[in-house]
C-alpha cells in the first residue's frame, strides 16, 4: 500500500529507469495467490513511455535502452495470460516481430552499446559492444510466451538461433565465466567476467541461461506434443502415460532419434519442427519412411497409435547460406543450418587479463579496446550465389577450411581468441 499516496507524476518519474521485470514477478504472485494487491502492484509498474507506443503498434524504439523494453513487454505478455487483455497480447506480438524483423543481428542478439539504433544502418553497428546478453535472455522468455499462444514455428526458429549462437557461446568452457556482450566487430573476441570482481546484470542472467536448456524443447496441448529443439533429452507426458527419449549429436549431425515408452497404446500427434533453414527432411517411423508433405517453416505432424518401443528418426539437411545485412549486401554472416559461422583469427595483440575483464577498470566491458591488429584479414571472398563452394568441411566436427587457409567454426565454439563473423 505504500505507493498508493504517490501522485501520478511521482509514479511516472520513479519508473523512468530500468527496473527489469518486477511487474512480471507481481503478476506471477497474483497468479499464485489470487491476491489483488499483487495485480495492482504489477499494473503500478506499467511504464507509459515504453508501452503506450507499442499499444498503438508503433516502432518508437529510436535509440532507447534496449533491455529497458523487453522485460516490461514480458510483463504485458503475462498480463494477457492472466486477464485476457487483448491489447497486451497484440502489443507483445507486435514488439516481438519488430525486434526480430528489424532489430536483431544474425546470431539472434540485439542492441549496440545496450541501445537501439536505426535498423536501416545495421551494418554500421557491428561493434565490440553488440548483443547484450540480458536482451537475448529476455527475448527468449518472451518467445516462450508467444509460442504457447500461437504454436508458430518461426518463433521456435528464432529461439534455436539465439540459443545456439548467443547463449551457448556466452559461457567460457574453461572457467564458467560469462560474457556481457557478443562482439561482432571483426577481429574482436569475447570478454568474460571474473570470479570475484564482476557481477554485471549479464552475470546474473548469464548463469541462469545455462540452466534453461531444457525449458523449450517440448510443448504440448490437447492435440499432441511439439518437438521444438533437437537436444538429447527425455520428457514424460503423465496424462498420456507416454515418455519420449531424444538422442542426437545435433548440430554435429543432422539426425535426431526418438524412442517412445508407452504404458498403454495411446493415439496422439507428435509434431516435429521443420525448421526454415532445412529442406528435404527425411522422417521414418519404426524404420519405414513416411511422406513429408509439409514445407519448411512448419511442423511435421505424425498422428497414430503409439506403442511401447516405437521409434522415430528425422534427418534435417543443413546447407551453407549467407545472411546479408538489410542495408549492405556486401556484409553478410555465413550460416550453416541455424548456426552462425566465424573465422579463427588467433590471439595476436591480446594481453592479460584478456579475454577476461580487468577488475581495476570501471565497467571495462563497455569501454574495452580490442586492439585489433591493422593487418588482420577481416573478409572472405566467395560466390554469393554458391557460398558453399568456398568451404570444405573437415571430419565430423563442425570445422571448415577455405583455399586461403581460413579455419571456420560455429561462433558458439570460438573462445579465447579473435574471430571474424
What spans do the regions from the language model cover?
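Short, surface-exposed beta-strand/beta-hairpin micro-motifs centered on an aromatic residue
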Residues: 299-301
Amino acid at each position: 500500500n505504500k505507493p498508493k499516496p504517490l501522485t501520478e507524476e511521482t509514479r511516472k518519474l520513479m519508473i523512468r529507469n530500468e527496473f527489469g521485470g518486477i511487474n512480471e514477478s507481481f503478476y506471477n504472485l497474483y497468479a499464485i495467490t489470487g491476491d489483488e494487491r499483487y495485480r495492482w502492484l504489477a499494473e503500478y509498474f506499467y511504464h507509459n513511455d515504453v508501452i503506450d507506443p507499442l499499444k498503438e503498434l508503433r516502432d518508437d524504439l529510436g535509440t532507447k535502452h534496449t533491455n529497458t523494453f523487453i522485460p516490461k513487454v514480458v510483463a504485458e505478455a503475462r498480463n494477457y495470460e492472466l486477464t485476457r487483455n487483448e491489447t497486451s497480447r497484440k502489443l507483445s506480438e507486435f514488439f516481438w516481430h519488430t525486434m526480430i524483423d528489424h532489430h536483431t543481428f544474425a546470431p539472434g542478439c540485439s542492441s549496440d552499446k545496450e541501445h537501439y539504433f536505426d535498423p536501416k544502418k545495421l551494418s554500421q553497428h557491428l561493434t565490440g559492444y553488440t548483443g547484450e546478453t540480458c536482451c537475448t535472455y529476455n527475448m527468449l522468455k518472451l518467445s516462450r510466451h508467444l509460442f504457447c499462444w500461437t504454436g508458430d514455428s518461426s518463433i521456435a526458429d528464432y529461439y534455436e538461433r539465439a540459443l545456439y549462437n548467443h547463449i551457448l557461446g556466452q559461457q567460457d568452457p574453461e572457467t564458467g565465466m560469462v560474457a556481457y556482450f557478443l562482439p561482432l566487430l571483426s577481429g574482436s573476441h569475447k570478454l568474460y567476467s571474473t570470479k570475484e570482481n564482476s557481477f554485471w546484470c549479464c552475470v546474473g542472467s548469464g548463469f541462469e541461461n545455462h540452466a534453461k536448456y531444457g525449458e523449450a524443447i517440448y510443448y504440448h496441448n490437447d492435440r499432441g506434443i511439439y518437438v521444438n529443439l533437437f537436444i538429447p533429452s527425455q520428457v514424460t507426458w503423465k496424462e498420456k502415460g507416454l515418455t519420449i527419449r531424444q538422442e542426437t549429436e545435433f548440430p554435429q549431425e543432422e539426425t535426431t532419434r526418438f524412442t517412445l515408452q508407452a504404458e498403454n497404446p495411446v493415439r496422439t500427434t507428435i509434431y516435429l519442427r521443420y525448421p526454415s533453414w532445412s529442406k528435404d527432411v527425411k522422417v521414418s517411423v519404426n524404420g519405414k519412411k513416411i511422406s513429408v508433405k509439409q514445407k519448411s517453416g512448419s511442423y511435421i505432424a505424425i498422428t497414430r497409435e503409439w506403442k511401447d518401443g516405437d521409434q522415430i528418426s528425422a534427418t534435417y539437411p543443413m546447407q551453407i547460406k549467407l545472411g546479408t545485412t538489410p542495408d549492405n549486401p556486401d556484409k553478410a554472416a555465413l550460416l550453416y543450418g541455424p548456426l552462425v559461422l566465424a573465422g579463427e583469427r588467433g590471439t595476436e595483440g591480446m594481453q592479460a587479463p584478456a579475454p577476461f575483464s580487468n577488475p581495476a577498470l570501471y565497467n571495462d566491458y563497455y569501454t574495452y579496446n580490442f586492439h585489433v591488429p591493422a593487418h588482420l584479414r577481416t573478409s572472405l571472398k566467395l560466390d554469393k550465389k554458391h557460398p558453399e563452394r568456398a568451404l570444405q568441411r573437415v571430419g565430423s566436427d563442425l570445422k571448415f577450411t577455405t583455399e586461403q587457409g581460413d579455419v571456420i567454426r560455429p561462433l558458439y565454439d570460438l573462445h579465447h581468441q579473435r574471430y571474424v563473423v
